[in-house]
Each structure stands twice: as structure tokens, then as C-alpha cells.
């Protein structure tokens, strides 16, 4: 997973994350310096996911082109915001 921030925070590249997609539900989990982070959401249609992480006041979107191995989107969490890109296995 690659994460880019709007602030001067350096980007995270190649970070490990777990992706589970089951029907129209999606769960993304990863670890950071504060512990495990879990975003859960649903496919709103055609690979457009809306996710939340209530513990971090996080909201996110992820989008997937049908033949792509990537999920890409925007996130907001505890006042920070940026973009992320996840490579599917």
C-alpha cells in the first residue's frame, strides 16, 4: 500500500496491508505506530467503495477499474488527508 499525505508528512510506500473483499463488502487493515487500523465499507456500484474507520474518525474512498489490480482513492483521518493506492494480490 502506498499512502501520500497533503501535509509535509513523508509518503509511505510499499506498506503491508490486508484486503478482504466479500461480495459488496470490503475491509482494509494495516498497522501503524498507534496499532492496527481497520477501514470497513461497501461497494456503492461498479468498484466504487466507501469506507469508514470510526476509531480514527476516518473516511475513505477506493475505486477499481474492472481489469485493474489497483484500488486507488482519497482518505481523511484525524485531520490528515491524502491519497492511497493498494495493489491487489
Language model: regions and residue ranges:
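Central antiparallel beta-sheet cores of small beta-barrel/beta-sandwich binding domains
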Residues: 1-89
